[in-house]
């Protein structure tokens, strides 16, 4: 953990978790833990964000604020002025969609809402200002570790202990 904190400049108010289950498990773990109001905004840019959307819909309302589905996910849509309801719990992106080969060059304007990012295919490949995010996760088998493990970097204020309706895993 110390090495990762040093390498990424992870602030002290973030926890670093090493979890089994891989990145796909985070598609459901994130909405189960972060949807306080039952609403999240997702940006659909390819196969991975599409799968994350499907899982999040099982936990609450999902608003797809921007999508590149119209051109078979060949671009990242303009995210400078997204329609984000005030009671949105978080904004979710897959920052690098490997199947269609698109990546964000600029983070979306979340208008003060928590930004959640799947960085599986780009984890540790370039500098990342962790403070721009509420939560970052990455399946480490693509870049830095064994299959079936994920690194989650989460801001401490997002960790909840008031949830008694979650599965045991």
Where are these regions (language model features)?
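Conserved active-site segment immediately N-terminal to the catalytic lysine
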Residues: 116, 130-141, 150
């Amino acid at each position: 953990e110390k090495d990762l904190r040093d390498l990424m400049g992870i602030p002290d108010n973030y926890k670093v978790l090493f979890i089994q289950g891989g990145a796909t498990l985070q598609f459901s773990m994130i909405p189960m833990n972060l949807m306080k109001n039952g609403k999240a905004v997702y940006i659909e840019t390819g196969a991975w964000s599409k799968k994350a959307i499907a899982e999040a819909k099982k936990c609450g309302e999902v608003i797809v604020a921007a999508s590149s589905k119209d051109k078979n996910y060949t671009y990242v849509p303009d995210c400078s002025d997204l329609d984000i309801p005030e009671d949105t719990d978080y904004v979710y992106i897959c920052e690098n969609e490997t199947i269609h080969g698109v990546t964000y060059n600029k983070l979306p304007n979340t208008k003060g809402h928590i930004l959640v990012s799947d960085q599986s295919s780009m984890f540790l490949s370039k500098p990342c200002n962790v403070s721009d995010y509420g939560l970052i996760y990455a399946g480490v088998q693509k870049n830095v570790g064994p299959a079936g493990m994920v690194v989650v970097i989460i801001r401490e204020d997002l960790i909840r202990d008031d949830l008694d309706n979650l599965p045991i895993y």
